[in-house]
């Protein structure tokens, strides 16, 4: 369950004048119920000391909702929220939470919005100019003194009505990221049916024309030539308006417990003890004085229980912060604690904290959260090319991450998020960045459990960085929003970094207000004020925190990342990658209509990013045409694109390990996943179909790997091969073997190195290679890393051209374009011999597992073979899916294996389709 959600403790802040006050929350639920059309569905139950009544209830209002436009609706809020109001003509909401356009798509009003240009041609573009009513009825549990409605995500303004009474107006309920807690005790009907109505007013301001509103922006993530307002204000037709995060009713007694926090001190470099400090807010909601005991209990299986308590007296309506420090309570110094580590370095162990307010030894309020014992520090070095790094538990963390995005319509889908996070772990990325687009708390909880570090912060370029256009309300909303998100994020072990801005740096009044909120809420992690090097003081002095965003945002050849002459390929970068990403053909045909598949046309551009350098897919078309040859179909073009994405993405991640810690500390790929079927940068697409970038990244992110630098230095006359170790343990006695094959499959060079030692987090030189064969226009470099006994640990296969890729001088390294002075010629791969492969598939011992064997009986190279698990011979690939490797190359008279696995709950694979580059597919049954 949630760090808070298991007992109804989602942190929040009530909007106040000036700096936002810490929220008062009834974190007293012990039974988590989900209200679904008037019925309770028990999700989690934690037994208290019988026969005491429950300390509280947390009811998610997820069912029975309806939606309608307020345009032309004569009824006011009092009428709409009254019992018996006839909403039969309204649109039934299939699932909540949901934005307006998300509901209209799910309900079939505007179906299949992501296909072709439907998002433009099939939807009225003025949905954001209308107000919208959300309405539901629910039963409120009886027997409690206080009832709160919690709205953690409303976009953008709202009136809240309950049982014919207005609870809050749109002057108070404003801000996409502000959490609103509303006391509805005087308006609710305990034990009876209640009617809730929410009138949503979408974001309407257009920056540069009539100010801003602090919602969120897709900026160049969608093409503003088609969607939104030209020149930088892109949006879908409802502007993501609606109730986009879960709504809860919280019922409790006289005392509520506010958002709790735990901070950790480690005696670094030692980690054999930990000093914990626990913070909790308590509030007396009654009109009489209350006395009790506040108890904090920390548990973890296999560890001694820690319990601390102190008496508390509260006057009527008094709220107070209670702290438990290890100086006062020695038991809060843990001996030999289980630490939370990123999954690449260890186990992400979690502890449970429960806080009870007891009266007469009976809990009357309860809060709970899960936390990790760990420390995170940001370190700023003296380097000039970006020199910010993160240290976890005293250990340097080389960040090789990617940027997560929710769905374009902000669909709430924890199962999809779980699949995305599993992909992140399967890939090997060790950080996910969220540039606003702050998803539900469930996303953070899953990251805690999986050991995936997260970086959060505000969006670039639009509302959040147009400070000169902010009015008084915007400043208030900004403070409320930050306090809400920090209160939600701070207990979570996976959250490592908060950025107060992206491309810009807040003006001093805003920056100081942000910093005060972070300090007041005991933010235990790293903070930066900008993640770029663009900001300047009035005298021209750079104002930055060691992180930069110099790109590139277009494809680069592998040698670029190792050359050492391009600034963007080193240092600490918050985003870089390829903003023109072509998915596998199976995905391409899922969103481009058949008559628009080829040649590339406006329907493709509709699904591209907005930056002029990316909107026409200019760079990736140039790359594919000049390096792999012109295409005659969309399928041919997409197949070639997988080669290009594989080699470039692999090189980006490899270089940030092989380049050494002194000059390489952070690279975050732009982006991890697709927010809709799109050509905007991603490692895997909206359909969760892994392509060339995925398996290239997976190779580049192997914790222990052998890396070839694509002859990046020495004018293509010498290449360096290195061993990188991003695993948790030092290694020694390793062996490296590198062979060069020509196009006919003959071995033209064979070199070995032995006795290689490489420490954790380090890199070691293995050997150098001379030029490849002069009589083979393309050749293969096969690099193997072996255990001391010769067992293969990993293999990397690189294809190289006699004609080199050369970006030219650093001045050519423009962020949004690929301009080279010479291009590799890979066209010989189009006519390479395609051997007849022997392919078999065998079911594994566990459900959903399949081993695919690819045997090459010929003397030629079998190049770039992809396996797909299927349910039937002609079906689409099962998705989501995991393979230990794919797009494999099988050398003469050898056999390769691919291990495939369908995640639990997925269909049973019965067939496998295998396709080599430029060849026809082979389909075999799973035995």
Feature names for model-found ranges:
Residues 219-236, 254-261, 374-391, 803-824:
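Low-complexity, Pro/Ser/Thr- and charge-rich linker/hinge segments at domain boundaries
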Residues 40-150, 224-255, 382-383, 608-640, ...:
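Extended carbohydrate-recognition surfaces in non-catalytic/accessory domains of CAZymes
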Residues 201-208, 358-364, 785-794, 919-923:
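Short acidic/polar inter-strand loop motif in beta-rich domains
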Residues 43, 47, 66-72, 124-256, ...:
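Accessory beta-strand-rich segments of carbohydrate-active enzymes
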């Amino acid at each position: 369950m949630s760090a808070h959600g298991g007992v109804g403790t989602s942190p929040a802040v009530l909007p106040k004048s000036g700096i936002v006050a810490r929220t008062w929350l009834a974190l007293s639920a012990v039974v988590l119920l989900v209200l679904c059309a008037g019925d309770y569905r028990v999700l989690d139950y934690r037994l208290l000391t019988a026969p005491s009544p429950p300390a509280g209830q947390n009811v998610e209002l997820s069912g029975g909702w309806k939606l309608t436009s307020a345009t032309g609706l004569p009824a006011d809020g009092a009428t709409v929220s009254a019992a018996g109001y006839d909403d039969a003509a309204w649109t039934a909401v299939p699932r909540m939470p949901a934005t307006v356009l998300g509901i209209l798509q799910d309900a079939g009003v505007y179906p299949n919005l992501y296909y072709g240009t439907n998002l433009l041609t099939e939807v009225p573009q003025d949905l954001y100019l209308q107000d919208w009513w959300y309405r539901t009825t629910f039963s409120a549990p009886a027997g409690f003194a206080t009832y709160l409605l919690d709205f953690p995500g409303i976009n953008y303004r709202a009136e809240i009505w309950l049982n014919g009474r207005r609870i809050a107006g749109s002057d108070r309920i404003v801000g996409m990221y502000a959490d609103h807690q509303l006391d509805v005790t005087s308006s609710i009907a305990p034990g009876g049916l209640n009617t809730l109505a929410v009138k949503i007013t979408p974001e309407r301001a257009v920056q540069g024309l009539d100010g801003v509103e602090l919602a969120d922006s897709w900026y160049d993530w969608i093409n503003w030539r088609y969607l939104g307002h030209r020149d930088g204000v892109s949006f879908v037709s409802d502007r993501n308006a609606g109730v986009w995060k879960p709504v809860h009713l919280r019922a409790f007694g006289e005392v509520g417990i506010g958002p709790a926090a735990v901070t950790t001190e480690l005696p670094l470099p030692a980690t054999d003890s930990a000093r914990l400090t626990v913070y909790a807010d308590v509030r007396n909601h009654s009109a009489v004085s209350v006395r009790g005991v506040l108890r904090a209990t920390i548990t973890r299986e296999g560890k001694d229980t820690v319990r601390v308590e102190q008496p508390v007296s509260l006057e009527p309506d008094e709220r107070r912060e209670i702290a438990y420090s290890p100086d006062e309570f020695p038991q809060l110094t843990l001996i030999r604690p289980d630490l939370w580590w990123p999954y690449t370095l260890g186990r992400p162990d979690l502890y449970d904290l429960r806080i009870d307010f007891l009266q007469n030894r009976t809990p009357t309020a309860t809060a709970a959260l899960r936390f990790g014992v760990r420390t995170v520090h940001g370190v700023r070095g003296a380097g000039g090319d970006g020199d910010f790094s993160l240290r976890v538990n005293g250990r340097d963390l080389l960040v090789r991450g990617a940027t997560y995005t929710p769905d374009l319509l902000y669909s709430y889908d924890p199962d999809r998020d779980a699949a995305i996070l599993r992909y992140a772990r399967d890939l090997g990325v060790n950080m996910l960045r969220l540039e606003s687009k702050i998803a539900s708390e469930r996303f953070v909880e899953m990251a805690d459990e999986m050991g995936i570090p997260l970086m959060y912060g505000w969006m670039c370029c639009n509302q959040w960085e147009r400070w000169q256009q902010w009015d008084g309300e915007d400043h208030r909303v900004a403070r409320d929003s930050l306090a809400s998100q920090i209160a939600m994020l701070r207990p979570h072990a996976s959250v490592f970094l908060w950025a107060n801005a992206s491309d810009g740096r807040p003006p001093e009044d805003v920056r100081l207000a942000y910093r005060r909120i972070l300090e007041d809420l005991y933010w235990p992690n790293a903070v930066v004020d900008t993640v770029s090097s663009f900001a300047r003081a009035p005298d021209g002095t750079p104002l930055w925190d060691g992180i930069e965003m110099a790109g590139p945002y277009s494809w680069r050849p592998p040698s670029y990342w190792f050359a050492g002459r391009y600034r963007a390929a080193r240092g600490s970068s918050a985003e870089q990658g390829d903003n023109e990403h072509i998915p596998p053909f199976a995905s391409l045909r899922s969103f481009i209509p058949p008559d628009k598949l080829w040649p590339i046309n406006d329907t493709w551009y509709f699904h591209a990013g907005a930056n002029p350098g990316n909107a026409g897919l200019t760079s990736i078309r140039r790359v594919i045409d000049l390096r792999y040859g012109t295409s005659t179909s969309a399928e041919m073009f997409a197949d070639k694109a997988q080669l290009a994405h594989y080699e470039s993405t692999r090189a980006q991640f490899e270089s940030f390990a092989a380049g050494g810690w002194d000059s390489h500390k952070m690279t975050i790929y732009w982006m991890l996943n697709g927010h809709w079927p799109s050509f905007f940068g991603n490692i895997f697409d909206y359909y969760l179909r892994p392509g060339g970038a995925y398996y290239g990244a997976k190779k580049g992110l192997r914790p222990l790997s052998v890396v070839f630098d694509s002859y990046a230095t020495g004018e293509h006359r010498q290449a360096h091969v290195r061993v990188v170790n991003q695993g948790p343990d030092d290694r020694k006695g390793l062996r490296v073997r590198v062979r060069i094959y020509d196009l006919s499959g003959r071995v033209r060079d064979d070199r070995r190195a032995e006795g290689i030692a490489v420490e954790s987090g380090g890199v070691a030189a293995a050997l150098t290679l001379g030029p490849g064969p002069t009589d083979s226009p393309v050749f293969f470099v096969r690099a193997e890393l072996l255990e001391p006994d010769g067992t293969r640990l990993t293999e990397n296969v690189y294809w190289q051209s006699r004609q080199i890729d050369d970006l030219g001088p650093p001045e050519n390294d423009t962020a949004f374009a690929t301009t080279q002075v010479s291009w590799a010629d890979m066209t010989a791969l189009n006519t390479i011999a395609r051997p007849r492969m022997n392919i078999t598939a065998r079911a594994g011992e566990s459900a959903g597992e399949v081993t695919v064997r690819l045997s090459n009986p010929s003397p030629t190279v079998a190049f770039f073979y992809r396996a797909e698990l299927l349910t039937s011979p002609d079906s689409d690939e099962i998705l989501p899916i995991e393979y230990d490797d794919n797009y494999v190359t099988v050398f003469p008279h050898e056999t390769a294996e691919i291990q495939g696995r369908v995640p639990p709950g997925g269909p049973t694979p019965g067939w496998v389709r295998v396709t080599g580059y430029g060849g026809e597919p082979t389909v075999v049954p799973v035995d």
